[in-house]
Amino acid sequence: MSHRKVSVLALALAGAVSFTTVGVPATFAVDAGTTTSVSVVSPAAQPNPSGDFEIDKNGVLTAYTGSSTEVTIPDGVTEISTEAFGNAQLTKLWISASVRVIGDDAFVSQDLKEITFQDDKAHPSQLATIGDRAFQSTSLATITLPGSVVTIGDNAFAGMSRLTSVRLGAKVAAGQLVAAFPGAKALASIEVDANNRNYASVDGVLYTKDHSHLIAYPQAKNKGGLLRGP
């Protein structure tokens, strides 16, 4: 058969074949000389596994299925769902700037000792909402929230027996924090950014901006317990 006839036949066969592009997990790799079995994942499949996380099509992290004590929330996650880490054993956590919402009970009762929120000029934090009991009964000693946080749920930091200080940003809305710290027996200081229009801090005590109402008096400053405003 001539070279021309072979070329024509090859083109005819190529035209009869259609190709479909499918997604595979980003961690897939093959070493030379080995055979690897790969599960092909349809882009429409939900939830979408990514490492030890289950993340839906909207970027909501619905569950952590791993066993590591040190966890990094990946970039692209927009929300950490209610009780997403209910079966985890966390001690150290890094949260990417893309996270906008931390849901109710997200990290409740974790032995969490260190938390870092990505928040810099190149990657400003988008975190706006912290849900009810989000960090309740964790082992954190200090918390510095990103300046983007607006709402903080009831009992968000309740029962945190090792918590000594909290620093709040400029955007925390009025009406927050009245019931955020019950049971935080070691809490000695609540500081707030001077540019916050709703709150002011004097010697670690939280007031409304005009100082007309007491919002929270840290429990370690008061032997009788945590004082709260109306």
Regions found by a protein language model. Name each.
Residues 18, 26, 34-37, 95, ...:
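Generic short amphipathic/hydrophobic targeting helices enriched at N-termini
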